[in-house]
């Protein structure tokens, strides 16, 4: 049964070997000539170890010009390093937009399907969106820089010089091929031929391949005079033909010595046989809708048309095999080499096995020549197992392990291989392909797992990838895209991600607040602003602290700050102390609801400014304005009691205004009542006495009494 392990596996979902593995050795290049005295090892970002290599300080010579130590990052991962860190970041940022668009479309289609949309329309629309998503990702994984084409093509160049593809793109195309792309179901074998022609170079790192044979032969090609006399010439052509690389085979055939002008006269029959085989190869039937320009073969989109074309083509091969011209061909290598190629085109299993180098190439050759109508994964998996037995290998390439998992419809193996060999990015993004074409994958990925805290596999792998992103300073800001798509634990981890960011950096904080705004996390943004405000205040940046606490609308913290500020001002309010906190008062503004007790300082600042205008000899209007501010201060509950008497003493000029009384009876009684409250408060423990002298207090009382009498007379 697909997806189940054998009895010998002990019941594991994914087979696990208990054999001891050889320890992995990581090179450490630190570049110090002197002996290492000490090592310090700590975790870096992601799977990086930060190794600090230190010299012996006692043996250090300042004149040797060598540094005292080096810090080296060692990456602990199964990746082969074919993709550099900048390329990984480009892929990470480039995949955000397609991923977010697909999630948005998923939500839209899900809403429509609950209303009017039929299931068939839903599946069709979703498949189109997944394919568009896959094409965007595949374009992102392609090499952005292509090598320029040569101005003059070398006639003996068999393999084009191109930048080596990546295993990540090869794995993505395999996932797309078998899970998402429904248009290629009828010509799946041909798609595998195309896949192998592009990525056989990757298999060369761990397997003997046809590509490596061609590459080695091309190096020797320049020095060969009579190419048809070399057995490797016929060997590489048979190998290339077995996997459908027709253009290479035809080009190599045209390098045959019988095509040279000085040879045509006495090698006419030999040349005719070579040309006949070349024509048959170029006319080979292909079960596919179309071919790219420059590719050989006759395409047939429908099975009946392909069968007719193939029968006619095979009859031509049989007719050529029985031709009498073979007897007239005097060149032994040419005769045997061409006949071997005819056997390959007929589908001789022994010839196909001899021509291929590994089981994947043998698998593709069988699909191309023996089983071109293979569709189901069951048949392909059975054929792949036979090919593996026919051409066993000690170590299997990661792409081939992934292919075996796909053909075996073993979703657990596919996920395990993607995670182990291609990293968390691959699993998080390929999950959409896996669930698009596999019912088993859909169930496995979206089934809630108790052992995972109630989340499903899809959410788990997105959380893992988001954690990788958040561990790096250059990618943390795109982690919220993936966390927001996780319904169960995403928002909680997103909140933790914001709390981990350095609050002392305003740009980082503003970026976090913007992300919170996008995802409507107002509670989180308020906490972030509060944390930042407290941090700035404690580290002496009082203005920034008050600003962020105001933005967070935290009245409690602002009240505490107000008390601290009052304590720092002291028992009296002088012009010198006013200058120290005047900037903070300016920052507070007039929003007393969110300023706590600091509202008093704002009002006092305005009162002092008005009083200064009065002392400068301005008009009566300035004096009235100063009185209004004084009354407002004395009425305000935010004005501390210990400041009442200093305020009245500062206002003696207003109380003793020579022309008329500036305070009416009610206002003067208010001031006298405040003095009475101060007299009673002196009897309580903990009262803070003013620094004013008794004479100053008497002056205030006399001024208020005089002003009260004048006010009575004026109002009568």
Curated annotation (Swiss-Prot):
Subunit structure: Part of the nuclear pore complex (NPC). The NPC has an eight-fold symmetrical structure comprising a central transport channel and two rings, the cytoplasmic and nuclear rings, to which eight filaments are attached. The cytoplasmic filaments have loose ends, while the nuclear filaments are joined in a distal ring, forming a nuclear basket. NPCs are highly dynamic in configuration and composition, and can be devided in 3 subcomplexes, the NUP62 subcomplex, the NUP107-160 subcomplex and the NUP93 subcomplex, containing approximately 30 different nucleoporin proteins.
Family: Belongs to the nucleoporin Nup85 family.
Subcellular location(s) of the protein: Nucleus envelope; Nucleus, Nuclear pore complex
Name of the featured protein: Nuclear pore complex protein NUP85
GO cellular component, one term: nuclear envelope
Keywords from the UniProt entry: mRNA transport, Nuclear pore complex, Nucleus, Protein transport, Translocation, Transport
Any single Pfam family the record assigns to this protein: Nucleopor_Nup85
Phylogenetic classification of the source organism: Eukaryota, Viridiplantae, Streptophyta, Embryophyta, Tracheophyta
Organism: Arabidopsis thaliana
GO BP: mRNA export from nucleus; protein transport; response to abscisic acid
Function: Functions as a component of the nuclear pore complex (NPC).
């Amino acid at each position: 049964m697909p997806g189940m392990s054998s009895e010998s596996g002990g019941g594991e979902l994914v087979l696990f070997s208990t054999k001891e593995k050889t320890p992995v050795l990581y090179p450490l290049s630190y570049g110090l000539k002197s002996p290492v005295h000490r090592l310090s090892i700590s975790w870096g970002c992601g799977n990086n170890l930060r190794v600090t290599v230190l010299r012996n300080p006692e043996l250090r010579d300042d004149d040797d010009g060598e540094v005292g130590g080096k810090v080296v990052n060692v990456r602990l991962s199964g990746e082969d390093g074919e993709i550099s860190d900048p390329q990984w970041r480009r892929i990470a940022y480039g995949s955000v937009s397609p991923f977010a668009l697909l999630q948005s479309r998923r939500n839209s289609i899900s809403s429509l399907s609950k209303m009017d949309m039929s299931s068939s329309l839903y599946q069709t629309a979703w498949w189109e969106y997944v394919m568009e998503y896959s094409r965007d990702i595949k374009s992102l994984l392609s090499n952005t820089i292509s090598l320029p084409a040569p101005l003059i093509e070398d006639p003996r160049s068999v393999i084009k010089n191109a930048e080596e593809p990546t295993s990540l793109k090869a794995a993505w195309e395999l996932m797309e091929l078998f899970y998402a792309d429904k248009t290629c179901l009828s010509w799946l074998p041909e798609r595998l031929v195309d896949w192998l022609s592009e990525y056989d170079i990757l298999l060369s790192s761990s397997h003997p391949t046809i590509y490596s044979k061609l590459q080695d032969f091309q190096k020797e090609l320049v020095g060969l005079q009579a190419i048809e006399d070399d057995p490797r010439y016929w060997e590489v052509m048979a190998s290339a033909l077995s996997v459908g690389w027709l253009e290479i085979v035809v080009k190599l055939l045209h390098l045959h010595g019988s095509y040279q002008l000085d040879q045509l006269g006495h090698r006419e029959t030999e040349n005719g046989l070579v040309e006949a085989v070349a024509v048959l190869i170029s006319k080979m039937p292909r079960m596919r809708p179309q071919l790219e320009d420059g590719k050989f073969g006759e395409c047939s989109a429908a099975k009946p048309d392909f069968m007719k074309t193939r029968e006619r083509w095979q009859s031509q091969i049989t007719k050529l095999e029985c031709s009498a011209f073979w007897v007239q061909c005097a060149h032994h290598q040419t005769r045997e080499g061409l006949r071997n190629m005819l056997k390959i085109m007929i589908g001789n299993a022994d010839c196909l096995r001899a021509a291929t180098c590994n089981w994947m190439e043998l698998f593709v050759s069988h699909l191309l020549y023996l089983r071109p109508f293979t569709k189901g994964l069951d048949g392909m998996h059975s054929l792949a197992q036979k090919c593996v037995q026919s051409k066993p290998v000690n170590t299997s390439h990661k792409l081939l392990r992934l292919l075996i998992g796909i053909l075996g419809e073993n979703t657990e193996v596919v996920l395990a291989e993607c995670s182990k060999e291609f990293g968390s990015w691959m699993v998080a993004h390929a999950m959409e392909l896996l669930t698009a074409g596999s019912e088993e994958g859909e169930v496995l990925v979206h089934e809630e797992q108790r052992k995972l805290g109630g989340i499903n596999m899809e959410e788990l792998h997105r959380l893992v990838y988001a954690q990788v992103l958040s561990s790096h300073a250059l990618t943390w800001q795109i982690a919220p895209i993936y966390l927001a798509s996780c319904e169960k634990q995403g928002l909680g981890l997103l909140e933790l991600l914001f709390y981990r960011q350095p609050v002392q950096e305003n740009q980082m904080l503003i970026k976090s607040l913007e992300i919170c705004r996008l995802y409507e996390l107002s509670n989180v943004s308020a906490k972030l602003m509060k944390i930042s405000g407290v941090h700035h205040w404690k580290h002496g940046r009082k203005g920034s602290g008050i600003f962020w606490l105001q933005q967070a609308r935290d009245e409690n913290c602002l009240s505490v700050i107000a008390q601290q500020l009052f304590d720092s001002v002291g028992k009296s309010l002088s012009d010198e102390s006013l200058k120290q906190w005047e900037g903070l008062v300016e920052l507070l503004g007039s929003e007393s609801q969110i300023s706590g007790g600091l509202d008093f300082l704002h009002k006092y600042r305005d009162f002092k400014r008005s009083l200064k205008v009065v002392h400068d000899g301005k008009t009566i209007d300035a004096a009235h304005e100063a009185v209004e501010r004084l009354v407002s201060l004395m009425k305000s509950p935010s004005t501390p009691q210990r400041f009442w008497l200093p305020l009245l003493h500062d206002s003696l000029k207003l109380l003793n205004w020579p022309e008329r009384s500036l305070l009416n009876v009610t206002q003067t009684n208010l001031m006298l009542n405040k003095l009475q409250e101060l007299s009673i408060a002196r009897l309580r423990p903990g009262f803070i006495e003013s620094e004013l002298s008794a004479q100053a207090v008497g002056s205030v009382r006399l001024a208020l009494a005089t002003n009260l009498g004048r006010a009575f007379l004026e109002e009568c």
